[in-house]
C-alpha cells in the first residue's frame, strides 16, 4: 500500500453551488468574447521584400515558437488574413500591389511594419523607395531595426494582441442582419464587376 499523508485520507469538503458555478462558468459580453478570440487567433499574411523577412520567418522556428501567440497559421491569400506584416524595402513599384493586397483583407485588419525600411524608408532616401509604408496604408505596430531580431517580432505580436484585446467593436461587425458571420459592407468585387467586364484595354505596367 502506498504511503499517503494523513490529510489525503480525509474526505474532501463539500463544494457549494456558488463555488461550483465560479469554477465552471464564464460570464462575459459578446464584445469581450470577440476581442479575446481575435486577440489569440491572428491570421498573418506575410509580405516580405528583403532581408528583414529572413528574421521574420525565423520567429516561426521552434527556437522562438511564434505558435505560442496563436499567429502561426500563415495565410496564402489576403482574403483569409487579418494581419499584414510588411518587412523590407517598399519600392514605388510595389506600393500599388501592396495596397491592393491590403484592400482585399477583411476588416478588422491590422498592419505591422517590420524593419527600418518598412517603417521610414531606412537608409534608402531615394526616388524609388517609399519613405514608410504608412504613407499609403495605416500601420498599427512599428518594429525598428536593420534588421530587427526575431524577438522583436514576438514583442510586436504581444503589443498588437494587447491592442486588439482592448478594442470594442459594435455587434454589427460580428453578427450581420442574417445572424451570420461577416460584414454588411458590399464587396469590392461586386462594386467593380460591371466596370471590369466593360474594360477592353489594359493599362501598361508603368502607369500602375
UniProtKB/Swiss-Prot annotation:
The keyword Cytoplasm does not apply. Keywords: 4Fe-4S, Cell inner membrane, Cell membrane, Iron, Iron-sulfur, Membrane, Metal-binding, NAD, Quinone, Translocase, Transport, Ubiquinone. One of its GO terms (cellular component) is respiratory chain complex I. It comes from the Bacteria. Binds 1 [4Fe-4S] cluster. NCBIfam families: nuoB_fam (TIGR01957), PRK06411.1 (NF005012). This is NADH-quinone oxidoreductase subunit B. The gene is nuoB.
Amino acid at each position: 500500500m502506498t504511503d499517503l499523508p494523513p490529510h489525503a485520507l480525509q474526505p474532501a469538503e463539500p463544494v457549494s453551488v456558488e463555488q461550483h458555478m465560479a469554477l465552471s462558468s464564464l460570464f462575459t459580453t459578446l464584445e469581450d468574447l470577440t476581442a479575446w478570440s481575435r486577440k489569440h487567433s491572428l491570421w498573418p499574411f506575410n509580405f516580405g521584400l528583403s532581408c528583414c523577412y529572413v528574421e521574420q520567418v525565423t520567429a516561426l522556428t521552434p527556437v522562438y515558437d511564434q505558435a505560442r501567440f496563436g499567429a502561426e497559421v500563415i495565410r496564402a491569400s489576403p482574403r483569409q488574413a487579418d494581419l499584414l506584416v510588411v518587412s523590407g524595402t517598399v519600392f514605388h513599384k510595389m506600393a500599388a500591389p501592396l495596397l491592393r493586397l491590403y484592400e482585399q483583407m477583411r476588416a478588422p485588419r491590422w498592419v505591422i511594419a517590420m524593419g527600418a525600411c518598412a517603417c521610414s524608408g531606412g537608409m534608402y532616401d531615394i526616388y524609388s523607395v517609399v519613405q514608410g509604408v504608412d504613407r499609403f496604408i495605416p500601420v498599427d505596430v512599428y518594429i525598428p531595426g536593420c534588421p530587427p531580431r526575431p524577438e522583436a517580432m514576438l514583442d510586436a505580436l504581444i503589443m498588437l494582441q494587447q491592442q486588439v484585446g482592448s478594442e470594442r467593436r459594435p455587434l454589427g461587425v460580428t453578427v450581420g442582419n442574417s445572424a451570420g458571420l461577416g460584414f454588411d459592407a458590399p464587396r469590392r468585387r461586386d462594386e467593380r464587376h460591371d466596370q471590369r467586364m466593360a474594360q477592353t484595354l489594359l493599362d501598361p505596367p508603368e502607369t500602375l
